[in-house]
């Protein structure tokens, strides 16, 4: 099976980290984010993966050239933003059979093998994974028939107007004939394609339970780290009192809660809660970090107090710095 991974965004909500590294290559515990996505695939069924990339494409190509994977990887560049539909259409030359599409910043418990099986059994043009949420207002909502056919889409409805709590969960199985329906140029798969075929009974919904996390913002990045950690999606590092700690770290007299510390970090006499600290960073004594992301090779001075901050790579923060929200340095 051929797989398209949608990874064309700039990752602007994770800036300034993404000014150094494209979002697919940001470290998620002991692997990159895009490798976490590839780990979801049924390896025995996959022979080709196409990464639909739009930002720092050469970095992504170089990374995959040095990976030993059991399938071919092609990095297909977007010269301009194409939307979900345009990005898929841009990969058409590599598609010759039923294919899978998955968002490149998604960690999910969906059983992709079962999704593929149900799709092939149904004979429809498109099948999409569906996840039930309490608040559907940030998502595309679907209406299902009793036999799990999708008959209607509703994009980001008001809570009182939503006709269900089932949302599009970012994993699709499609037939190549879908390309005949796609308009030219940039377009949305959800708004411009699925809305055309759903009323014709050509779409299947596949509900699943468990988790569905998209690592697009600092809070959801932390949630994705937490999900990978709890689900044991890591092979190096250690579990230290329910915190993930990478190799060769020196952590002295520090209280840590629900945090993720990458390789070669030094933390002295500080309080770290619900935070992610990337490799080769130093946190000096007396500092307090909460819901904070610290980039690689950063140095946090003594007695700093940070909450809901994203700290840039290579930053040097002076002693006593206090900040709530935003980026450091301020940009």
List PLM regions with ranges.
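N-terminal glycine-rich phosphate-binding loop and ensuing alpha1 helix
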Residues: 1-61
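Glycine-rich hexapeptide-repeat left-handed beta-helix
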Residues: 93, 265-331
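Conserved beta-loop-beta/alpha segment of the NTase-like Rossmann-fold superfamily
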Residues: 60-146, 183
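Short internal beta-strands
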Residues: 50-54, 129-130, 293
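Catalytic-core segments of class I nucleotidyltransferases/pyrophosphorylases
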Residues: 99-100, 107, 113-120, 134-136, ...
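C-terminal accessory/binding modules appended to enzymatic or scaffolding proteins
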Residues: 245, 250-269, 273-278
